[in-house]
Structure formats: C-alpha cells, structure tokens
UniProtKB/Swiss-Prot annotation:
Pathway participation: Steroid metabolism; cholesterol degradation
Catalytic activity reported: 3-oxochol-4-en-22-oyl-CoA + A = 3-oxochola-4,17-dien-22-oyl-CoA + AH2
Function: Involved in the third cycle of side chain dehydrogenation in the beta-oxidation of cholesterol catabolism. May play an important role for the initial macrophage invasion, possibly in response to the acidification of phagosome. It contributes partly to the virulence by increasing the efficiency of beta-oxidation. Catalyzes the dehydrogenation of 2'-propanoyl-CoA ester side chains of 3-oxo-4-pregnene-20-carboxyl-CoA (3-OPC-CoA) to yield 3-oxo-4,17-pregnadiene-20-carboxyl-CoA (3-OPDC-CoA).
Cofactor: FAD
Cofactor binding: number and manner: Binds 1 FAD per heterodimer.
Induction pattern: Induced by cholesterol and repressed by KtsR. Up-regulated in vitro by acid shock and ex vivo by macrophage challenge.
Binding site for FAD: 227, 238, 295, 299
pH dependence text: Optimum pH is above 8. No activity is observed under pH 6.
Swiss-Prot/TrEMBL GO biological process terms: biological process involved in interaction with host; cholesterol catabolic process; fatty acid beta-oxidation using acyl-CoA dehydrogenase; response to pH
Family: Belongs to the acyl-CoA dehydrogenase family.
Name by which UniProt lists this protein: Acyl-CoA dehydrogenase FadE28
EC number(s) on file: 1.3.99.-
Record text on subunit structure and interactions: Heterotetramer composed of FadE28 and FadE29.
C-alpha cells in the first residue's frame, strides 16, 4: 500500500485548495469547477473516481468549509457512480456540475447508518422516518435506504415532510418523514443493499473528518507559534508541545485509516475491518483532539467567528451522525468476535 497521492489526486487537492484559500462557500466550489470533478465526462464533468473524491473532501475539511460538499459529492455522487445505471446517473447527476445539491437519508431514530433500516418499501411505496438528512430542502434528489431497497426520491415528492433540526455548525439538517411516497421502477437502484451505501458513506465521512482534524491541528500550531506569554511563543512550552503531539497522533492515525478505507473500496477489496476502525477512531479520537485545540486557543476558541469553531462543531456533528464512540466500538467488537 502506497498512500502517497497520485498526480491526479494531488491535482484535485490543488484545485480545491486554490478555490478555498479565497472563498470557502459552496458557490465558490461551484464556480471553481470543484463540483464538476466527480461528474462523468458525458455530463460535463471530469470523471474522477473515489480516490480523488476522498482527496477533495479531505481538502474541504482541511479548510473548515461548511457546505453541501459532503452531502452532494460524498453521500450523493459517490454511491450513484458505483451503484446506479448510466440512465439513472444521467438524470440524477445532471445538475451537480452547475451546483445542484444531492443528499442521502441514511440514519433513523436511534440508528446510525443501519444496514437493516426500519424504513419500508412495499408495492412501490416508501414509508418511514429518517434523521440527520443534510441540505434536504436544497436538494434535487435524495438517496434513501429502506428495508429491501435503495431508492432515489425528490424531497418535494408527495408524502415527504421535512422538519429542520439544529446542528452544532449551523448547517441545514432535517428529519424526513415519508408516508407512502410513490417510487417509480426507474428510481430504484437495482440489486443494491443499504450495507454498501453505508460503507461508502462512512468512507467519505472519514475523508472529511481527516481534513477537519488536520486543519484544526495546523490552525492551532500556527496560533501557539505566534501567541506569546512571558515573552516566549506558547509553542515553546513543554506542556503545549505535548498536547499538540497528542493531536498530531490522532490526525495521522485518522489519516491512515481513512486512506486505507478509500483504497480498499476503490480496489474492490474487503474493507470491513478498516471501516470498523475508522468509525470508532473518528468518533473516539477526533472530539478529544478538537477539545485540545480549543483549549490551546484560550479565549480565542470561544469566538464563533474564528475558524476553530467550524472545525470543532463539524466534528461534533459527524460524531453524532456516526452514532458516537460507544456505538462504533460495539460494532467493531461484534466484528472482532466473529473472527
């Protein structure tokens, strides 16, 4: 395994960085051509793959950008590229390059990324409740996992109701209730189960979290290098250096497992063990790393207009969406008990 970025991955990362260094908005990503990168060439995109989307989302996270990028490119485009037919891709991905938003309804009350969703799909009708659905009101299409199918529906379809719910980072998130929503045969992803969609979702969330932790580490290291107490930079104090080292270790280990998961999925290898570790490591190690970064910023960390707030709050939201460390440890332990 060689996780050094390829020329194409580095080019994608450079494009994202060049855009976000000027403006971290969704509009900037659209105008800069970032949203077109994973879209098939026949639809006006660049046709990059999972490796490159992972690099893209890591850079979005590194810059602390709170946008529909994860929902659209990670939770929407990535599974559709792998699991949808060409005709379905042509319909669902047509507007992405120009800023169209996609999302996925995967979580349910009390269940994070369930492989056996309670949402039912019977007789062409979809019924159930989904939580933590990002940017649903803006979305053109929504990927939905059900008990025996994975389907794509419009958030404005008859029978869909949405209620906005609060998030730590202020992004749009909704509870979606579906009551007998009609789904045409052409909107069903053939022979696709929730398990595979959840694997891809965890992988792209991990790539985004990788960037968030790395970005917070860089921000904090720069801050303590320039902030002085007793006439010396904070970074020269042994305690500060030791705490930064803890964040560095968390960042590097998350980076390793996130890249390993992307690699294994892209190469069609079994990624189950790595996904289990990724889910647990992000939920158990990223929040404490954010707490250390927040602490080392002192009073500056309390300023919601300062970038540290975006990193910390987004990690809190991701941890919640993944079910938290206890849930992830239970899943990892259950997998280990089978081997």
């Amino acid at each position: 395994m060689d996780f050094d970025p390829t020329a194409e991955q580095q080019a994608v990362a450079d494009v994202v960085t060049s855009v976000l260094e000027r403006d971290i908005s969704w509009e900037a990503l659209v105008c800069g051509g970032v949203t077109a990168l994973p879209v098939p060439e026949r639809l006006g995109g660049d046709g990059v793959g999972l490796f490159e989307v992972g690099a893209l989302l890591t850079e979005v996270g590194r810059h602390g950008a709170v946008t529909p990028a994860l929902a659209t490119l990670g939770l929407g485009v990535v599974p559709l590229l792998e699991l949808a037919s060409a005709e379905q891709q042509d319909r669902f991905l047509a507007g992405v390059a120009k800023g169209g938003v996609l999302t996925a309804a995967l979580n349910e009350p009390g269940a994070a990324l369930p492989d056996r969703p309670a949402t039912s799909f019977v007789g062409g009708r979809l019924s159930g409740t989904k939580v933590g659905v990002g940017y649903a009101e803006q979305a053109d299409w929504m990927l939905v996992t059900a008990d025996n199918a994975v389907v794509v529906v419009s958030p404005t379809a008859d029978g869909v109701r949405m209620v906005r719910t609060p998030t730590s980072n202020g992004s749009d998130e909704y509870v979606m209730t579906m009551d007998g929503v009609a789904v045409a045969d052409c909107d069903i992803l053939a022979d696709v189960a929730a398990h595979r969609v959840n694997q891809l979702a965890l992988a792209v969330m991990g790539a985004y979290a990788d960037g968030l932790v790395a970005g917070a580490l860089r921000l904090t290291a720069d801050y303590v290098a320039n902030r002085k107490q007793f006439g010396k930079p904070l970074s020269t104090f042994q305690t500060v250096a030791a705490q930064l080292a803890e964040v560095y270790i968390a960042s590097r280990t998350i980076d390793l497992v996130a890249k390993s998961v992307i690699w294994r999925l892209a190469e069609d290898l079994d990624a189950g063990d790595d996904l289990g570790v990724l889910g647990y490591w992000v939920t158990s190690q990223a929040p404490p790393a954010m707490q250390i970064c927040h602490h080392l910023h002192g009073g500056m960390g309390m300023d919601v207009t300062y970038p540290m707030h975006r990193y910390y709050s987004t990690i809190k939201d991701l941890t919640r969406l993944l079910g938290g460390p206890s849930h992830r440890l239970e899943l990892l332990g259950a997998r280990c008990s089978l081997t």
